[in-house]
Amino acid sequence: VARLAVLYEHPQWFRPLFEALERSGIACEEWRAEELAFGLEETEWPDLVFNRMSASAAWRGHGRAQFAVRELLAVLEGRRVAVVNGAAAYELEISKVRQMELFRRAGARAPRSAAANSPRQLVRACQGLTFPVMVKPNCGGAGAGVRRFDSLAQLEAEAERVEFGCDHVALVQEHIPSRDGACYRIEILDGQVLYCLKVQRDGGGYNLCPADACAAESRAVFTRCEPLPEAEAAALHVARLGRIDLCGIEYIVDHRTGEPVFYDLNVLSNFVANAREVVGFDPYERLVDYLGRRLHALTRIR
């Protein structure tokens, strides 16, 4: 029987996954990314590794995990171990700059953006953009470190307090005015849309994580909806081009044009809490079915 390992860091996000695997009778090894060691002379690897490493790990004191995972994925793929959300996908998870480049390569509209690695250069990078702007750590998640600046003068006054994150790079984007005050999140698994959520922020903050474990921090309201057809097509193309097996892709409908504008890609995508009530089914069951099919195919190869 093919062996499965799940590589992860957050202590709570993946309980539903492990419970669903157990219900399905699929055994797995749990690899904790913040306490990781692996032998370069190792010859017996799992047949399938499911990468569930998050870009927000550094904000929980686990920045060392992000760099070790990058090396582990390179080793696994070099040994021809099958990886769900492998090295190419992970590079997108930990770089918002690369996400913007992927959107552009895919022909998906994205906000005008720039990047910088110091407060002084951040101010310089913004001079070609139209305010207001959003400044985000390049490697981050769950809204950590995200700030809005309404003028260049405000940014100049507060640039020294901007969070650059674990790689010391910040992304700055023109703010996109939303047509309905909402953003939309398309969940994709194995080249197909699982569901789409309309996300309404309730109050301040930018933590739009939909999972149970984020409920105390995220004040967003999630409802199921149908994505714009052009947004769905673009999101699927982005996932294919980025070699991403599972992800959540977010867009806003620009009130000036009515067009979808893509601004975030979550390779580590948490399913919505209370999924049966919100989307009508348990996405973990479909995820485990997918993993089961991958394992079955690998068992036949063995």
Q: Where are the language model's segments positioned?
A:
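Extreme N-terminal starter segment of soluble prokaryotic enzymes
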Residues: 1-5
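Conserved N-proximal alpha/beta basic substrate-recognition cap immediately N-terminal to
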Residues: 9-112
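Short glycine-rich anion-binding loops that position phosphate/pyrophosphate groups of nucleotides
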Residues: 54-57, 138-140, 268
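Rossmann-like NAD(P)H-binding beta-loop-alpha module
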Residues: 105-131
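Protein kinase-like catalytic core scaffold
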Residues: 133, 194-195, 247, 259-263
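Phosphate-binding site of ATP-dependent enzymes
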Residues: 144-241
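Glycine-rich phosphate/pyrophosphate-binding beta-alpha loops
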Residues: 202, 266-280
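A long amphipathic alpha-helix within ATP-dependent nucleotide-binding catalytic cores
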Residues: 207-260, 283-301
